[in-house]
Amino acid sequence: MPAVSAIIFDLDDTLYPERQYAFNGFAAVAVKFKEWLGDPLEAAGAMKRLFDTEHRPRVFSALLAERGMAQSDVLIARMVETYRTHLPTIHLHPDADAALARLFGQYKLGLITDGPAISQWAKIDALRLRTRFDAIIVTSELGPDCAKPHPSAFELIAQRLGVEPPECAYVGDNPAKDFVAPNALGWTTVQIRRLDGIYLNSVAPRGGVPRFTIDALDDLNGILSRV
């Protein structure tokens, strides 16, 4: 089996804490819509609280309901737009920053991330990642059905990096979707378990169990030396 020559990373909760982005977005929404939501600090705090409940997929709708406000599709759409287009202040996990510095030049590096393109590129730019990867793919730019676990982004990034599937390793955090495609393609798969990760306890579907699990990216070199 060929040695790994390319490492492809997930972004959210793999390289930086996704909560940082979400909480930045809630603050932006709270400020812009203070006429409807009241005190921005209180409103942002309410959204942060709802984020850690079953209301996470519909925080804005739940917030309006808590306040006894009508479920205005127009208002919610504007809140979502503000959230997705805000310019975040976010930071890499220290081990991610160190790993990228250590691996750059030793391996070809790629990034695959799901989500609205405008949001994901804003994150990438806030983290100054464009020059730290040899190839970056935002799956929503490939088509509406190309998010993980669809294999298209994985196949494309291997082509762009000029490597064969057995030479690829993929590092992600979410077993519910991250590892199905790279497992099927014959990649080495590694889950990073972030204790503050949103999807830490997600269950892997059939074919989606990662080959390796680590608690810090400092352990990645040791894993790859065993492949």
Give names to the regions the model predicted.
Residues 54, 90-93, 114-117, 148, ...:
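Short alpha-helix boundary/capping motifs
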Residues 8-10, 112, 171-172:
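Generic enzyme active-site microenvironment
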Residues 2-94:
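N-terminal helical cap/lid subdomain that shapes the substrate entry/recognition surface
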Residues 1-4, 101, 108, 117, ...:
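Asp-based, Mg2+/Mn2+-dependent phosphohydrolase catalytic module
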Residues 24, 28, 46, 59-62, ...:
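Alpha-helical elements of Rossmann-like donor-binding domains used by nucleotide-donor carbohydrate transfer enzymes
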Residues 81-111, 118:
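Short, acidic loop-to-helix structural element flanking the phosphoryl-transfer center
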Residues 27-34, 61, 65, 84, ...:
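Class I S-adenosyl-L-methionine
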